[in-house]
């Protein structure tokens, strides 16, 4: 069972429909016990970083997500949800994030239209489980005005928008997509299927303990 975190700022409906399409068992929840009982977690998000962190704090979900991140349970952040995984953001004000990944969220300063909205090429950097069946230089769908300034060793996918945008990051059980896999057609569905596979593998490992 995959828990989609509902904290009032997520693209819940599209993520829910995508998981339904790939046949993944899921629950939309903000209940701490349901999140801990899940086999994997998706943190979606659309909106401002400081507001999102305030809401997560109010719902006591910061601690929950940090505990999930520090375990081996698979965690996938999408768009703003990916940004929240980092140490802090410069959006509106300096604001601390979940600190599950090293790096700072900075505003895009490019000679192009902001937000970066639409399809862009994603170049793979290295290999991870979520790349299975995903061709290099596939096109994915973005909507964002901020990007992650982070170490190269956690970057597994890059798009060019006047600056190198980390499109996909990963460290251990933690994954983050700056783009929207649920809106990225067959490529996005394949990545979500791969995440489902990672979740199932983790679940099987727990049953054997």
From Swiss-Prot:
Protein name (record): Imidazole glycerol phosphate synthase subunit HisH
Underlying gene: hisH
Active-site residues, as the UniProt record annotates them: 79 (nucleophile), 180, 182
Pathway(s) annotated for this protein in UniProt: Amino-acid biosynthesis; L-histidine biosynthesis; L-histidine from 5-phospho-alpha-D-ribose 1-diphosphate: step 5/9
Subcellular localization(s) per the UniProt record: Cytoplasm
Primary location recorded for the protein, binned into one broad class: cytoplasm
Catalytic activity: 5-[(5-phospho-1-deoxy-D-ribulos-1-ylimino)methylamino]-1-(5-phospho-beta-D-ribosyl)imidazole-4-carboxamide + L-glutamine = D-erythro-1-(imidazol-4-yl)glycerol 3-phosphate + 5-amino-1-(5-phospho-beta-D-ribosyl)imidazole-4-carboxamide + L-glutamate + H(+); L-glutamine + H2O = L-glutamate + NH4(+)
One BP term from GO: L-histidine biosynthetic process
Organism annotation: Bacillus thuringiensis subsp. konkukian (strain 97-27)
Assembly: Heterodimer of HisH and HisF.
Parts of the chain that traverse the membrane: none
Domain Glutamine amidotransferase type-1: 1-205
GO CC annotation, single: cytoplasm
Gene3D superfamilies tied to this protein: 3.40.50.880
EC number: 4.3.2.10, 3.5.1.2
């Amino acid at each position: 069972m995959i828990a989609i975190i509902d904290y009032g700022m997520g693209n819940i409906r599209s993520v829910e429909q995508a998981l339904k399409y790939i046949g993944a068992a899921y629950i939309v929840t903000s209940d701490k016990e349901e999140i801990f009982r899940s086999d994997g977690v998706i943190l979606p998000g659309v909106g401002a970083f400081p507001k999102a962190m305030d809401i997560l704090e109010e719902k006591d979900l910061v601690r929950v997500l940090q505990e999930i991140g520090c375990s081996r349970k698979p965690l996938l952040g999408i768009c703003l949800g990916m940004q929240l995984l980092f140490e802090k953001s410069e959006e509106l004000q300096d604001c601390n994030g979940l600190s599950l990944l090293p790096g700072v969220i900075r505003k895009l300063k490019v000679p192009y239209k902001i937000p970066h909205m639409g399809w862009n090429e994603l170049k793979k950097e290295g290999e991870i489980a979520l790349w299975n069946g995903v061709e290099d230089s596939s096109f994915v769908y973005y909507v964002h005005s901020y990007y992650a300034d982070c170490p190269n060793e956690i970057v597994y996918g890059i798009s060019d928008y006047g600056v190198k945008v980390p499109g996909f990051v990963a460290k251990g059980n933690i994954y983050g997509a700056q783009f929207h896999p649920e809106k990225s057609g067959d490529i996005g569905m394949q990545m979500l299927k791969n995440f489902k596979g990672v979740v199932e593998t983790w679940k099987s490992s727990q049953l054997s303990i």
